[in-house]
Amino acid sequence: MAELKNDRYLRALLKQPVDRTPVWMMRQAGRYLPEYKATRAEAGDFMSLCKNQDLACEVTLQPLRRYDLDAAILFSDILTIPDAMGLGLYFETGEGPRFQRPTDTIDAIKKLSIPDPEDELGYVMRAVSTIRRELKGEVPLIGFSGSPWTLATYMVEGGSSKTFEKIKKMAYEEPATLHMLLDKLADSVILYLNAQVANGAQSLMIFDSWGGALSHHAYREFSLRYMQKIVDGLTRHADGRQVPVTLFTKGGGLWLESMAETGCDALGLDWTVDIGDARRRVGHKVALQGNMDPSVLYASPERIHQEVDQILSSYGEGTGHVFNLGHGIHQHVDPEHAGAFINSVHELSAKYHK
């Protein structure tokens, strides 16, 4: 493997000194880029794009050709694990992901097998190794998975949901059934993420997109408990380096202290949290990633610059901050505005690292 030329992102996650705040964007390979749209059209559909290692590599690298980013993230989907379990993932136009066979009964859950990451998910591993090779050591590669709770919401609901009625009914009516599903998913995620590291991922991120839908107590029981199991089971060293792990619960601002206790290296923050306050609460234990509202990218470059300045100022001096959005970049954002965001982080952050 090529020697890593820019390790700013990995160093910040491990709270080691950096010359400026590293920056990348969730969904940086995505529909806001015309070159992404062209490659997706070539693939035919979204999952065909994910399953073609060369095209998945191409879209992963596209934002790095445009912008001076400090990390690349594997182009894939959080629903690869349930798809590999045989649920029949498909995408409805305007509806998002759906499953032909929802997992909403104990019998369906008992029948689920844990996918072999090198077999049923081999296409993801081939993409990871291809991307790592083609990066040529320019920046680190982030691997990722959805959290067990978030994956379970899609599996039990049969797709996206605004109310989470079916899975919450299961949580309160048949908690043992839901725990069986979450346990299988946690085991699957551990294998999946460790295989990504074995194939070249240099950092890992767990996306708990729907953890914020849970109550205070239920979050600990149905989401955090299983992310803890995953953190305990992950490969944390490879290629002579630490492999940092970031947990991101959207809507999880209430639970930062509990998340920091898991032994992860960093927490992702959504835009509802003040990053300075988060640093005071948990900055002695973990690095922080975030957390500009993606909608700010609709504003003028001058306004974007101001928002970046405000977040950097709130975090303050020293390492332990990876600048990012508070969630994925929106598809209708002007790519020039994304560039203004990245350039603002470069321009404004150096003074915080003297």
UniProtKB/Swiss-Prot annotation:
The record marks D77 as: Transition state stabilizer. GO terms for biological process: protoporphyrinogen IX biosynthetic process from glutamate. Its EC number is 4.1.1.37. Transmembrane segments: none annotated. It catalyses: uroporphyrinogen III + 4 H(+) = coproporphyrinogen III + 4 CO2. Substrate binds at R27, Q28, A29, G30, R31, D77, Y154, S209, H327. Pfam families: URO-D (PF01208). The keyword Lyase applies. The keyword Cytoplasm applies. GO terms for molecular function: uroporphyrinogen decarboxylase activity. GO terms for cellular component: cytosol. Its main location: cytoplasm. It is found in: Cytoplasm. Pathway: Porphyrin-containing compound metabolism; protoporphyrin-IX biosynthesis; coproporphyrinogen-III from 5-aminolevulinate: step 4/4. It is an enzyme of class 4 (lyase). Belongs to the uroporphyrinogen decarboxylase family. Catalyzes the decarboxylation of four acetate groups of uroporphyrinogen-III to yield coproporphyrinogen-III. Homodimer. This is Uroporphyrinogen decarboxylase. The gene is hemE.
